Amino acid sequence: GPPGPPGAPGKALKGDIPDPGLPGDQGPPGPDGPRGVPGPPGPPGSVDLLKGEPGDCGLPGPPGLPGPPGPPGHKGFPGCDGKHGQKGPMGFPGPQGPPGSPGPPGDKGLPGPPGRRGPLGPPGSRGEPGPPADLDACPRIPGLPGVPGPRGPEGTMGLPGMRGPPGPGCKGEPGLDGRRGEDGLPGSPGPPGHKGDMGEAGCPGAPGPPGPMGDPGPIGFGPGYLSGFLLVLHSQTDGEPTCPMGMPRLWTGYSLLYLEGQERAHNQDLGLAGSCLPIFSTLPFAYCNIHQVCHYARRNDRSYWLASTAPLPMTPLSEDEIRPYISRCAVCEAPAQAVAVHSQDQSIPPCPRAWRSLWIGYSFLMHTGAGDQGGGQALMSPGSCLEDFRAAPFLECQGRQGTCHFFANKYSFWLTTVRPDLQFSSAPLPDTLKESHAQRQKISRCQVCVKHS
């Protein structure tokens, strides 16, 4: 605002000195006055004045109301091609088409190989004589000698010549034997000869009728004995087999088929007493070396045992679980050697005359285990005639783990039936047998026999 009105003159105190004092200091500015009333608008400015600076931007206005919908747009361009769809399912076969028109003739084939040489034709007729040669035009030069002709056929034997005089030389060696002459006429019978020496003794005559029964002998010193032949029985169950009547039992055990050590197999004939071990073990052997050291259960050695008819397990067996799966056996003393006979058909083969039957079965031939190792049975051995057939007749025991199982790489081989009229025919037809009944019909039957004592 404008400066206020000047203040009233101050009154100086009357001093002791009658003269007036010095003028006082200027007072402080007064407070601001109230705001004045705005003045009237001034006259319009001259055009000659400078243009002012642009004002500040105004505050943004409120949003406007939505406008009306616009007109429809133009038609768009065609879109891009889509991705290839998946292949559809195969269609049904169409009907057979009409026969095609005959094709054009093929190209001429290659010439065939030359044919065989034909037989020699008959000699031709003699040709006409040629014209006489011009002796003056052709000088007579002798030609070369011709090629020797083929050897002619052998001539007939000439008549024997006259005996010539002896030659001047020394007497030669005797000549070769002449041809055999014709047989002469039989001579007249000669006089009877002298009596010959005594001939050799003739064959023994037929046995005579049995003589009368002798007197009873004295009482013996001890019990009787058999001949010492051994007979091995395998029950293919977990029960011990019974020896035939009159054959004492020597021992019982478990049916050992074969052993495998150092990746090599050692077979046991089921008809011999060594296949009946008194005590079972998944690893019944140790191996020793030249350094005087023996090792047991240090390698992946195995043992294979004849199995019982128990159902196949799903997992490996251990400890007491193994017992019902191992076949039991017995060794008996027999009066004679037992043999197996095989029919190679479905019929039971008969025992030879004066022999009696011990059991009938199926012809077990051979077996393989881990890798290409295995063994087999001699077809005359009673071990080749098992009383019961099954596709997996034995199980493998892994000695180090102490477990037994029917592994998939174990194979058994059996003698098959053969029809006599087809034994020399064409190749056998392949076949796969899955049913137990069909398998048994394909396997040869057998019988174990022993001679009557």
UniProtKB/Swiss-Prot annotation:
The gene is COL4A4. The lineage of its organism: Eukaryota, Metazoa, Chordata, Craniata, Vertebrata. There are six type IV collagen isoforms, alpha 1(IV)-alpha 6(IV), each of which can form a triple helix structure with 2 other chains to generate type IV collagen network. The alpha 3(IV) chain forms a triple helical protomer with alpha 4(IV) and alpha 5(IV); this triple helical structure dimerizes through NC1-NC1 domain interactions such that the alpha 3(IV), alpha 4(IV) and alpha 5(IV) chains of one protomer connect with the alpha 5(IV), alpha 4(IV) and alpha 3(IV) chains of the opposite protomer, respectively. Associates with LAMB2 at the neuromuscular junction and in GBM. Residues 26-44, 60-72, 95-122, 206-215 have a biased composition (Pro residues). It comes from the Eukaryota. Residues 1-222 are annotated as: Triple-helical region. Its main location: secreted. Pfam families: C4, Collagen. InterPro entries: Collagen, Collagen_IV_NC, Collagen_IV_NC_sf, CTDL_fold, NDNF. Disulfide bonds join 243-332, 276-329, 288-294, 351-449, 385-446, 397-404. Belongs to the type IV collagen family. Residues 153-162 have a biased composition (Low complexity). GO terms for molecular function: extracellular matrix structural constituent. Residues 228-453 form the Collagen IV NC1 domain. Keywords: Basement membrane, Cell adhesion, Collagen, Disulfide bond, Extracellular matrix, Hydroxylation, Repeat, Secreted. The keyword Repeat applies. Alpha 3 and alpha 4 type IV collagens are colocalized and present only in basement membranes of kidney, eye, cochlea, lung and brain. One of its GO terms (biological process) is cell adhesion. This is Collagen alpha-4(IV) chain. The keyword tRNA processing does not apply. Residues 1-218 are annotated as: Disordered. Type IV collagen is the major structural component of glomerular basement membranes (GBM), forming a 'chicken-wire' meshwork together with laminins, proteoglycans and entactin/nidogen. GO terms for cellular component: basement membrane; collagen type IV trimer; extracellular region. Residues 174-183 have a biased composition (Basic and acidic residues). Alpha chains of type IV collagen have a non-collagenous domain (NC1) at their C-terminus, frequent interruptions of the G-X-Y repeats in the long central triple-helical domain (which may cause flexibility in the triple helix), and a short N-terminal triple-helical 7S domain. Prolines at the third position of the tripeptide repeating unit (G-X-Y) are hydroxylated in some or all of the chains.
